[in-house]
Amino acid sequence: YPKGKEREYDRSGFKNRGSFTVLDPDGGADCDVAVVTYGRITSNVFAAIGLCAPNIGVRAVKLVRLLPLCADDVLDACGCKKILVVEEGCRSGGIGEAIAAAAARRGRGECVRVSAIDGFLTHADVPQLEKLCRLDAESVAADIASFAAEGITE
């Protein structure tokens, strides 16, 4: 990983589903937003879920294997219409775009938003870059809350 390694976080709540794991803090209750992520920033997503208001149901899907990606299985595991893909990769041609394309093909009304960037970054330390790219826990939590509050038109 650039400028670092995967950080530690409590993995005990994640349930193994083969090529991905699922964290459902509410034990399967209604999900407002599912967050798909992988790699080093999973710890930020995990922290962001803890920062979210208790009335927002959030499920996390952590990809363990990126390729081959069975996007339909990932979408099924999300279990809700609003899916936020948080990735430390590129927006165009990334995992989030593949999941969004699969959702569009399915035609089930899933709305996929990708939190990633296109382009080059300035030099900075990792926390500064994460904040700049909205990949820090506070920004991810704010994006989850904003997305949860939005309506979806089908």
Residue ranges and their predicted role:
Residues 1-154:
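Thiamine diphosphate
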